[in-house]
């Protein structure tokens, strides 16, 4: 007589249940890692934007005629207009426009929470994953929201003077 060896239905169900539990736990941990990565990416984009902006403004102060890959005219005599031109070069260059979305010189930076949008935009409000730039007098106001909900602890506000 041949004896066949096989798993019983109960043993198979136990294995499937264990795999399901492990998968559920893994998804929870994985989503935490992705949120953390989005926060880090947003902070990195903000930091790079601020450094780049300050460096390009300094080029103008040192006598350059243009900056920001030629999209910023350094010769604007009105300080408020110069600040506006800096914001426009960062966020709204007509030749870089795609569909209804405005892009600036840092067009390769995408919003970590919505890759269909640029990370750097001309806005006055906090929007998750976005570096929002607006002009106040001769200053650039840079608002960044790192997490969904944009609670005070998850936002940043930086002013960059275009005249100092």
Language model: regions and residue ranges:
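Alpha-helical protein-protein interaction elements
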Residues: 14, 21-25, 44, 74, ...
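Low-complexity, intrinsically disordered short peptide segments enriched in small/polar/basic residues
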Residues: 7, 11, 24, 42, ...
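Periplasmic/extracellular, small/polar-rich flexible segments of pilin-like filament-forming proteins
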Residues: 58-164
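Intrinsic disorder/low-complexity segments enriched in polar/small residues
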Residues: 3-6, 49, 131
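N-terminal single-pass transmembrane signal-anchor helix
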Residues: 2-34
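Membrane-proximal N-terminal amphipathic helix
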Residues: 35-65
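General helical secondary-structure elements
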Residues: 1, 34, 39, 47-50, ...
